């Protein structure tokens, strides 16, 4: 009975995948489907701690002017309420130096980030992955929210499922190398309202995957990702500021919200 339920869940996931279904092989269609991160992971702080860790995987800084803060005892910038994760960026008025990551911008904000404890790795055992969630994303100049995958041991690989850079356009990006990038830019009506962002990732050869990108259930693009097979990736939700999203950023607090984030995969053995 358990095997039958798993198969039914896989069939349902494939049906929702739309164009991605054609990329599935008969072997993968016969696999079982399993949940890696359930939509309930933002229900309370115990559920959050079981599936997510605070900050970026590498620490507090990245490529913008916000430094990430958050812990089990500090919820000023990473908080939960009613099943919704809220990241809050607040401008600071003191000198906190520069970011430890290139391009080493001056720190002008405190903000929040979380990353999943489980990693996404496409291989023979787990050839298909679904990564999705509902988000209210800021889109004012200087705001840089993201929902993305990036390499654990090297960069690239990278897949940006949600990325707004100071306007109402979402950037679906797939980095194969630092200079070999596919970008599909899609205008989103009212990014600050709830929208669903989704990636369906499927193994298509011994080394490569296809990544299908969706907004609100509508297929937007497929990117061919050479060399992604076997490379573990972190899943990150963060609110960075300025940098590629322009400056100056807002003086008032900025909020980025997420709910019903889900990660699932097919298992061949």
Where are these regions (language model features)?
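Secretory targeting and sorting signals
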Residues: 1-29
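Extracellular Ig-like/FN3 beta-sandwich strand-entry sites
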Residues: 128, 192-194, 232
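Beta-strand acidic-aromatic groove motif in beta-rich domains, primarily in extracellular
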Residues: 141-149, 207-210
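Low-complexity, Ser/Thr/Pro/Gly-rich disordered linker/stalk regions
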Residues: 30-129, 135-140, 152-153, 161-166, ...
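Short tryptophan-centered beta-strand motifs in secreted/extracellular beta-sheet-rich domains
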Residues: 42, 131-133, 193-204, 211-213
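Surface-exposed loop/edge segments in extracytoplasmic proteins
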Residues: 157, 179-184, 218-223
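Short, aromatic/His-centered strand-loop micro-motif at the edge of beta-sheets
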Residues: 175-196
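Short, solvent-exposed beta-strand-to-loop segments that form ligand-recognition rims
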Residues: 215-236
């Amino acid at each position: 009975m358990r095997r039958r339920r798993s198969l039914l869940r896989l069939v349902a996931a494939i049906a929702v995948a739309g164009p991605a279904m054609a990329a599935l092989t008969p072997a993968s269609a016969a696999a079982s489907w399993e949940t890696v991160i359930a939509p309930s992971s933002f229900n309370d702080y115990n559920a959050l701690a079981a599936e997510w860790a605070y900050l970026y995987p590498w620490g507090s800084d990245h490529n913008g002017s916000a430094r990430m803060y958050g812990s089990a005892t500090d919820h000023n910038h990473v908080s939960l309420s009613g099943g919704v994760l809220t990241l809050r960026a607040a401008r600071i008025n003191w000198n906190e130096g520069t970011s430890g990551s290139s391009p080493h911008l001056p720190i002008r904000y405190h903000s929040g980030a979380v990353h999943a404890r489980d990693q996404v790795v496409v291989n023979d055992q787990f050839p298909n992955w679904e990564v999705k969630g509902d988000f209210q994303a800021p889109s004012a100049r200087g705001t840089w929210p993201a929902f993305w995958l990036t390499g654990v041991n090297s960069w690239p690989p990278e897949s940006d499922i949600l990325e707004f850079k100071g306007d109402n356009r979402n950037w679906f990006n797939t980095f194969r190398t630092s200079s070999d990038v596919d970008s599909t830019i899609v205008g989103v009506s009212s990014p600050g309202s709830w929208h669903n962002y989704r990636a369906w990732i499927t193994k298509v050869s011994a080394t490569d995957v296809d990544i299908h990108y969706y907004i609100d259930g509508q297929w937007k693009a497929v990117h061919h990702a050479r060399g992604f097979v076997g490379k573990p990736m972190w899943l990150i939700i963060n609110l960075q500021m300025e940098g590629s999203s322009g400056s100056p950023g807002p003086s008032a607090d900025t909020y980025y919200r997420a709910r019903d984030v889900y990660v699932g995969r097919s298992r061949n053995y």
